[in-house]
């Protein structure tokens, strides 16, 4: 048994000793069968939340009403959830109620896809009542039971299906895809925040190029912020190297570019992204437009962008063109290292010094003068030393006076 499961085995065994069933469930079991890195390990049990809390000395009640208790075991927190069935769903988002049951199969039946409805006991024996292993072998995303019913219960499952295409490289089962097409309008019931969470995982997946066109093919894009008229653009997005992008702002910048979005800020705000991501994605796009090719970087542009953003610009450009970005990154690192200053804060003079030198009241001219100074320093026209900057500034003033 793999270490993540071994570390949590004590919880399973303790529940078993008290006469309850307990199993590893969900994504961790799926990823074990796929040979993927195993994330959070979740446990399902026949024990009721109160019974779980009575057995373990260190627990946190994070949602016992819905069956979930966090058990802290050997310094690690694990979600332990009572077997349950879901009542009717309200607004195609969440069940109005849950009913605790003593049957593992009943619990697995309520899950979204067969690959996520697999359990494993303390001995490593797989319990798979809905054909999840077969779906994994065939690399198919298939719902547990009737696809229409699953998507009507929780419309976000349709986005999850396409997100799993991006993460796993699986295909949608025919009936699953048909049901998404039929139920796509239900996505309008889902909050933007939940859709954005799925979209970010989709964009970060190694198979994003396969998943993005599916948003158009299934009609989901009609109900996603800013994508209603972007079906053909989403299909073209399959040509780009999405896995090359490591940062979320790079992915959103590429999406804006791929979709032909003219104004990135309103588009990204519609997704309710953090301002920091919106600002940085916009800055990447603006710099990409200002520097039309890797060889076009000036010292001033590199200084203003900073190394991190400059590298982001080139990786987005590479994702668009398919050309390797490493040579550009190496060259930008070399050039940035050679800049005499890396930030405006490193300039040997500030506004107060400039005002003292010129002897004029403060005003917009101070910023204009400081901008001229850092540009001269960055371009090698003057060394970043107070005395040399003073001499350069006096000479500049004399030249300007002559030209007036």
From Swiss-Prot:
Residues binding ATP, per UniProt: 27, 30, 111, 154, 157, 160, 163
GO biological process: RNA repair; tRNA 3'-terminal CCA addition
InterPro entries attached to this UniProt entry: Bact_CCA-adding_enz_type3_sf, CCA-adding_enz_C, CCA-adding_enz_firmicutes, NT_sf, PolA_pol_head_dom, PolyA_RNA-bd
Binding site for Mg(2+): 40, 42
Required cofactor(s): Mg(2+)
Binding site for CTP: 27, 30, 111, 154, 157, 160, 163
Pfam families listed in its UniProt record: PolyA_pol, PolyA_pol_RNAbd, tRNA_NucTran2_2
UniProtKB keywords: ATP-binding, Magnesium, Metal-binding, Nucleotide-binding, Nucleotidyltransferase, RNA repair, RNA-binding, Transferase, tRNA processing
GO molecular function list: ATP binding; CCA tRNA nucleotidyltransferase activity; magnesium ion binding; tRNA binding
Top-level EC class: transferase
Note: A single active site specifically recognizes both ATP and CTP and is responsible for their addition.
Family under the similarity heading: Belongs to the tRNA nucleotidyltransferase/poly(A) polymerase family. Bacterial CCA-adding enzyme type 3 subfamily.
Function: Catalyzes the addition and repair of the essential 3'-terminal CCA sequence in tRNAs without using a nucleic acid template. Adds these three nucleotides in the order of C, C, and A to the tRNA nucleotide-73, using CTP and ATP as substrates and producing inorganic pyrophosphate. tRNA 3'-terminal CCA addition is required both for tRNA processing and repair. Also involved in tRNA surveillance by mediating tandem CCA addition to generate a CCACCA at the 3' terminus of unstable tRNAs. While stable tRNAs receive only 3'-terminal CCA, unstable tRNAs are marked with CCACCA and rapidly degraded.
Subunit organization: Homodimer.
NCBIfam families, per database record: PRK13299.1
Protein name as catalogued: CCA-adding enzyme
Protein source organism: Geobacillus thermodenitrificans (strain NG80-2)
Lineage: Bacteria, Bacillati, Bacillota, Bacilli, Bacillales
């Amino acid at each position: 048994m793999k270490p993540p499961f071994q570390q949590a085995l004590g919880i399973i065994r303790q529940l078993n000793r008290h006469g309850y069933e307990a199993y590893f469930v969900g994504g961790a079991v799926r990823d074990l069968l796929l040979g993927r890195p195993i994330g959070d390990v979740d446990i399902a049990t026949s024990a009721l939340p109160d019974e779980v809390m009575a057995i373990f000395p260190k627990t946190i009640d994070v949602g016992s009403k819905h069956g979930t208790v966090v058990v802290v075991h050997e310094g690690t927190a694990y979600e332990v959830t009572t077997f349950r069935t879901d009542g009717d769903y309200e607004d195609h988002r969440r069940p109005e109620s849950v009913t605790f049951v003593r049957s593992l199969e009943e619990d697995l039946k309520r899950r979204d896809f067969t690959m996520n409805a697999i359990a494993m006991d303390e001995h490593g024996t797989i319990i798979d009542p809905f054909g999840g292993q077969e779906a994994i072998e065939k690399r198919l995303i298939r719902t547990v039971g009737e696809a229409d019913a699953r998507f009507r219960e929780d419309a976000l499952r349709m986005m999850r299906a396409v997100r799993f295409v991006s993460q796993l490289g699986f295909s949608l089962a025919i009936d699953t895809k048909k049901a998404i097409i039929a139920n796509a309008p239900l996505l309008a019931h889902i909050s933007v925040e939940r859709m954005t969470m799925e979209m970010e995982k989709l964009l970060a997946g190694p198979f994003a190029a396969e998943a993005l066109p599916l948003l158009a093919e299934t009609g989901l894009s009609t109900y996603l912020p800013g994508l209603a008229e972007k079906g053909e653009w989403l299909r073209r997005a399959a040509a780009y190297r999405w896995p090359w992008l490591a940062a979320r702002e790079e992915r959103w910048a590429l999406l804006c570019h791929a979709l032909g979005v003219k104004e990135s800020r309103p588009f990204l705000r519609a997704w309710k992204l953090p301002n920091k991501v919106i600002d940085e994605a916009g800055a990447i796009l603006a710099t990409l437009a200002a520097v039309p090719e890797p060889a076009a970087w000036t010292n001033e542009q590199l200084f203003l962008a900073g190394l991190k953003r400059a590298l982001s610009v080139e990786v987005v450009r590479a994702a668009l063109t398919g050309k390797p970005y490493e040579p550009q990154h190496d060259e930008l690192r070399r050039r940035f290292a050679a800049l005499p200053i890396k930030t405006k804060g490193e300039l040997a003079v500030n506004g107060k010094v400039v005002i003292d030198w010129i002897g004029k009241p403060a005003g917009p001219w101070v910023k204009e003068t400081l901008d001229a100074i850092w540009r001269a320093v960055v371009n090698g026209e003057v060394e970043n030393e107070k005395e040399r900057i003073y001499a350069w500034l006096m000479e500049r003033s004399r030249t300007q006076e002559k030209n007036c």
